[in-house]
Amino acid sequence: MSRSVVVITAGLSSPSSTRLLADQLADATRAAVGGRGESVDVEFVELRELAVEMAQTMVSGNRPTPGLETVQAKVVAADGLIAVTPVFTASYSGLFKTFVDLLDKDALIGKPVLIAATAGTPRHSLVLEHAMRPLFAYLRAVVVPTAVFAATEDFGGETDLERRVHRAAGELAALVVAERTGVAGFAPTGDEASGTLGPVTDFSQLLRGHDGS
């Protein structure tokens, strides 16, 4: 069964270091999924091409344009997500955040996500841990342990970028090809899966018959 991975890249130019890193992560993920005996369809989403549509959506009561709605549906349907952004002012780009803000709040629940970022210097690498990981944790996505940061000096030189790329891709592949249903008796069902707790016993009933001693 073929899996699907959507790569969201928030680079503002073409070519860009953000797209270059996204390409490397996508290639490594294809290889990692293939190594597990599965195939994967990878689709790229260049957010700069949706910038006008996202702005229109933001100022029109969050009613997405047809183009943006199509992309959102692909993200929801994907088995995994690779999210790559440049670092601006010690955080992800506004373009990237706008796209995330326009997603349904439940769109990424349980979805495997690989996070990555690019910047001019290694000093910005903590953005992955203090901005991107908390963002996707809030959205209840499953973020792979290895996040990938690439500074300008990491491209074209002898660095450990390739090793980090392949390690992160392997972690994403493991989640993407995993069974979509849990082991019998352990998978959430019914109210658990929907997040509803079900009937709640009144506290006074719990204390009935107890004298407090």
Where are these regions (language model features)?
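Hydrophobic alpha-helical membrane-association signature
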Residues: 21-25, 128, 168
